[in-house]
């Protein structure tokens, strides 16, 4: 929804598709997403629907769904998209078994489309409130990266372009492991020295693995690498860090909030 607001404020026609009629009805009734973005008013000009036909004739479609469902959603909406639409991934993770990044999954389903990524140190809660934020728009197709940049940029959302989407996504996926460990450090009250060491060695390991997986080393020193790692290891918006804190404190899985049990 935060990206939808950003694009709408730049003069674009925006429709948000969701599989849940209950969520769509609640947003239309309340004028905000009280679960994900409480207090952030959504402009009335943004459409919300459960009908995927809304994607027909779109210039750009952004996937903002849990990584587990990226492939199934990409397959589900395929009848409504042609080869001219730019497909953008905004989810973080790797596909189970294949270890493909989310943009690679999308590209495998849409081999003829330009596919890009928008990623970096950005919590939706802050983007939606207009907190100054900087992220990366990445694509092997530089023109597509520029189009993503122009669609969402604002005076509070600065977007840099990059031609290494794989490296950008690997940084965004693997930092969650380090953030969980950082939370455990906090839960154990290990101190700043320990956490700094963990984060520093963590980005080193992410870089080494990321290069082996096809990313460029310099990518991991930027917003989608060290930047995303810092915000995820230090923010209470981060579910991985919060889960790590509970583990470090010895809280049993059954007593953790439902979203932090796994």
Locations of regions flagged by a protein language model:
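Internal alpha-helical scaffold of NAD(P)-dependent oxidoreductase catalytic cores
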Residues: 69, 80, 105-113, 132-219
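NAD(P)+-binding Rossmann beta1-loop-alpha1 motif at the extreme N-terminus of oxidoreductases
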Residues: 1-40, 49-50, 76
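Generic structural signal for residues in well-ordered beta-strands
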Residues: 14, 46-48, 115, 159, ...
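Alpha-helix C-terminal capping/helix-to-coil transition sites in glycosyltransferase folds
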Residues: 56-57, 174, 226
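N-terminal loops that bind phosphate or other acidic moieties
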Residues: 62, 194, 260-261
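Rossmann-like NAD(P)(H) cofactor-binding subdomain of soluble oxidoreductases
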Residues: 42, 48, 53-132, 148-150
